[in-house]
């Protein structure tokens, strides 16, 4: 939920961002486009990084980072810096998107993996939809900055809950990060 709500919450804000930052409608699509591109790039690396440092630590780091970056992006008055935070959000979102299914595969009993994967995937869809809806409703009543702060605070609560409730990996085995493993993965 948290990762894709963070990614897509800017979509209903695009016209407001265009007015606030004095940019074109095309440029107002950059926050979502750049964060999605950064997500795609991050997905290549975060799986390998989690092979070294563990699944839960990467996912926890990702969730807290995304929440903090959302909070930061709400107070940035400069377009280029706002865009940079959106790129960082895309990169950090990949820490959950790439690792969660591996965690499920390693830690959930084989008979329950399908159900757990379904819950995760439905959570991502609900997150993407609810991020858009929540932001869209909020910006009808409050500023885009306040809406972003609220979504960031919700994500911070989710990250904290995740940290305390997700069990530590029992079946994880660390592997060193090697360029050869990265190359052979392709």
Which positions does each model-derived feature cover?
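Extracytoplasmic
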Residues: 1-25
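Small-residue-rich segments within alpha-helical transmembrane domains of MFS-like 12-TM solute carriers
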Residues: 4, 8, 90-98, 129
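Residue-level signature of mid-helix packing/kink "hotspots" within the transmembrane helices
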Residues: 8, 36-44, 128-129
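Conserved MFS/SLC helix-loop-helix module at the cytosolic interface between two early adjacent transmembrane helices
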Residues: 41-79
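Helix-loop-helix hairpin linking two adjacent transmembrane segments in secondary transporters
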Residues: 81, 110, 119-166
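Cytoplasmic helix-loop-helix junction between adjacent transmembrane helices
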Residues: 85-124
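Juxtamembrane intracellular "pre-TM" segments in multi-pass secondary transporters
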Residues: 167-186
């Amino acid at each position: 939920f948290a990762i894709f709500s963070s990614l897509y919450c800017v979509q209903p804000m695009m016209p407001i961002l265009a007015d606030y930052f004095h940019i074109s409608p095309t440029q107002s699509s950059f926050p979502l486009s750049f964060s999605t591109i950064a997500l795609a790039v991050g997905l290549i690396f975060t799986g390998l990084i989690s092979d070294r440092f563990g699944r839960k630590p990467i996912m926890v780091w990702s969730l807290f980072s995304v929440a903090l970056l959302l909070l930061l992006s709400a107070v940035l008055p400069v377009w280029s810096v706002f865009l940079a935070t959106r790129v960082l959000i895309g990169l950090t979102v990949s820490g959950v998107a790439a690792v969660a299914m591996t965690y499920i595969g390693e830690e959930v009993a084989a008979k329950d993996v399908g159900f757990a994967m379904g819950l995760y995937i439905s959570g991502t869809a609900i997150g993407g939809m609810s991020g858009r809806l929540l932001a869209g409703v909020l910006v009808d009543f409050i500023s885009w900055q306040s809406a972003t702060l609220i979504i960031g605070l919700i994500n911070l609560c989710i990250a904290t809950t995740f940290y305390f409730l997700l069990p530590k990996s029992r079946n994880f085995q660390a592997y060193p990060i090697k360029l050869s493993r990265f190359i052979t993965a392709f």
